[in-house]
UniProtKB/Swiss-Prot annotation:
Tree of life domain: Bacteria
GO CC annotation: cytosolic large ribosomal subunit
Gene source species: Caldicellulosiruptor saccharolyticus (strain ATCC 43494 / DSM 8903 / Tp8T 6331)
HAMAP family: Ribosomal_uL18_B
Keywords of the record: Ribonucleoprotein, Ribosomal protein, RNA-binding, rRNA-binding
Role summary: This is one of the proteins that bind and probably mediate the attachment of the 5S RNA into the large ribosomal subunit, where it forms part of the central protuberance.
PANTHER family from the UniProt entry: 39S RIBOSOMAL PROTEIN L18, MITOCHONDRIAL, LARGE RIBOSOMAL SUBUNIT PROTEIN UL18M
Molecular-function annotations in GO: 5S rRNA binding; structural constituent of ribosome
Bridged cysteine pairs (disulfide): none
Similarity comment: Belongs to the universal ribosomal protein uL18 family.
GO biological process: translation
Name by which UniProt lists this protein: Large ribosomal subunit protein uL18
Subunit structure: Part of the 50S ribosomal subunit; part of the 5S rRNA/L5/L18/L25 subcomplex. Contacts the 5S and 23S rRNAs.
C-alpha cells in the first residue's frame, strides 16, 4: 500500500496550530486572545502565557449568552462573543492582545469574532 497516510482536516488544523503557537506568545502587557470553535459552540479566552492563567473567557455555551442567541454556531454568535470578550477584557484593564486563530483559517466565524472584538475596542 501507500507510504503516505491521509491526514484529516482536524489533524491539519492541529499541525497549523502548533506551528503558529511557536510564534504567538501572550505576555502580561499583551496577552493572547485564543479562539476555539466546535461544531456547536465558539469559545474565546484571553491568556497570559507567562503565568499560564486565563484572564478572561467567553463562550456561546454560557447560559446568559446562549439565551440571547438564536443559534450558538452562527456568525452572529461569533460577533456577539467578540463583543463580550472585549467588554470583559476592558473591565480587567486589557486593551492590547495578540490574536491566536487556533489553526483555523481567518474566515467566517473566526474573522467575525476578531472584527467584533476590534470594533469593541481591543487592539491586535
Amino acid at each position: 500500500m501507500g507510504l503516505y497516510k491521509k491526514v484529516n482536516r482536524n489533524e491539519k488544523r492541529l499541525i497549523r496550530h502548533k506551528r503558529i503557537r511557536k510564534k504567538v506568545f501572550g505576555t502580561a502587557e499583551r496577552p493572547r486572545l485564543c479562539v476555539y470553535k466546535s461544531l456547536k459552540y465558539i469559545y474565546a479566552q484571553i491568556i497570559d502565557d507567562e503565568k499560564g492563567h486565563t484572564l478572561v473567557a467567553a463562550s456561546s455555551l454560557e447560559p446568559e449568552i446562549k439565551s440571547r442567541l438564536t443559534s450558538t454556531k452562527s456568525i452572529e454568535a461569533a460577533q456577539y462573543i467578540g463583543r463580550v470578550i472585549a467588554e470583559r477584557a476592558k473591565e480587567k484593564g486589557i486593551t492590547k492582545v495578540v490574536f491566536d486563530r487556533g489553526g483555523y483559517p481567518y474566515h467566517g466565524r473566526v474573522k467575525a469574532l476578531a472584527d467584533a472584538a476590534r470594533e469593541a475596542g481591543l487592539e491586535f
